[in-house]
A protein has these predicted regions:
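Beta-rich accessory regions
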Residues: 1-157
Length: 157
C-alpha cells in the first residue's frame, strides 16, 4: 500500500525543538529510531493530526516514566484518553527506541521495538490540513533515522 517514501535520515532537535515532517498527512507509515542515550528531552516524539487550532495527538517517549505514550489530551474532538506502554529494563539499557506508527484519518497505531508493545487509539483531527511534527520537550532529541511512507487509499471513502 506504500505510495511514495521520504527518507529524512538522522535528525537532531535542539532544546524544546519542533520540526514539521509533513504538512498534510492523510494516511502514512512512519519508521523512527530514537537514540535514547543521546537525547535529553523529558518527552519526545510526534504530534499527529496537528491542526492550525493547536489540536493534535501525541505519540512520544516519556523519559520520566520510561514509557511510550499516546496522549490525546490536546485533541479538539472525541475522548481525550491516554495510553502507555512500558519499556523493559533491557530495552532501556539498549539505549534505542524503534517506533513504527501508522496514521490514517481517524486512527493511530504504534508498534514499539518491533511489536513488543502495541498501542492503538482513535484520533479525530480538526478540519483542515493535518500535519505531523517531530517534537522535543525540555531537552534535545537525537533521531537516528526517520522514514515516512505515504499510503494509498483502499477505496472506502
Amino acid at each position: 500500500l506504500r505510495e511514495d517514501t521520504v527518507d529524512f535520515g538522522a535528525i537532531d532537535l535542539d532544546v524544546s525543538g519542533e520540526k514539521t515532517i509533513v504538512d498534510d498527512a492523510e494516511a502514512v507509515e512512519i519508521e523512527m529510531t530514537i537514540d535514547l542515550n543521546a537525547s535529553t528531552a523529558e518527552r519526545a516524539g510526534l504530534k499527529i493530526h496537528a491542526t492550525e487550532d493547536g489540536a493534535y495527538t501525541y505519540v512520544a517517549y516519556d523519559d520520566q516514566i520510561g514509557r511510550v505514550v499516546v496522549d490525546r489530551q490536546a485533541n479538539a474532538q472525541g475522548d481525550r484518553g491516554y495510553r502507555t506502554a512500558p519499556l523493559s529494563e533491557a530495552e532501556l539499557a539498549a539505549g534505542e527506541l524503534k517506533l513504527r506508527v501508522y496514521v490514517d484519518r481517524g486512527c493511530v497505531e504504534v508498534y514499539v521495538n518491533d511489536g513488543r508493545q502495541v498501542l492503538s487509539s482513535y484520533s479525530y483531527a480538526s478540519e483542515g490540513p493535518r500535519a505531523i511534527k517531530l517534537v522535543a520537550e525540555s531537552g534535545t532529541l537525537k533521531v537516528k533515522s526517520l522514514v515516512l511512507h505515504h499510503m494509498k487509499s483502499i477505496g472506502l471513502e
